[in-house]
Amino acid sequence: MFGYVIADLGRLTEAQRLRYHSVYCGLCRALYADYGAAGALALTYDMTFLTLLLAALYEPEERSGAARCLRHPVRAQQWASSEFTAYAAAMNCLLAWENCRDDWADEKKISAAAAGALLAPGAKKAATQYPEKAAAIRRALGQIAQAEADRTGYSETPANAFGDLMAELFTVRDDRWTDGLRRFARSLGKLIYFMDAACDLQADRKKGQYNPLLLLGIGSGAEFAPQLRLLAGDAAEEFERLPIVQDAELLQNILYSGVWTRFEAAFRPQQEEQA
């Protein structure tokens, strides 16, 4: 379920694009420093959003600079990081490893097994640093796997479990913002779960794999767009309750536009036909 919480680059200003890229590069540097080349290869924009959000909410001291790297050996890239960058890197590594485990369990992909083996040392390190988070991730993914294995009927248990996983990831402190962060992250998690289900619907139907929309009798992922917009509205409502000033427009771009990028790329022709 990686790759949904991304920016709509075409609607960003040049300054916003540079900011987004610098935080992304900062996360990549943290992954490489803490978890090696395998960790850096698991880099996602989803955790870039988490870094931006936590930094916007808590406004910690930030470090920045420019440096070359394996991906950009010629031209130095601007980077920015804060105390939340290392945390997001750890969560990125854990989630990437769990994703490889799930791909191997579900489809026996050799590539997933190989990537998982490379990520395992880093994931173990991250789990040692954040044992409660690692346990929560494993528990939520276990609930999802169990619910998906039980095909007796439609259930929102997997979506709720993924929402709980996101709520745990987004909670880094126990303070007055904790409840709001958890509500927002839970809403975002449910949106991502069902959006992923919509995008995977046809492939899952062909392979005979679990998909909640199949159990609802949905013929095409595009048909589920109205329900997704309701879920997106719930997430947006919770986000707007947070006292976000720093990078507010960038975060809004991701939530209100970027998060739809993959869905619209998959279903735009169908949506235009239905309009």
Model-derived segments and their meaning:
Residues 253-257:
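A glycine-rich phosphate-binding loop feature that marks nucleotide/adenosyl-phosphate handling sites
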Residues 248-252:
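Short, flexible loop/turn segments with low-complexity composition
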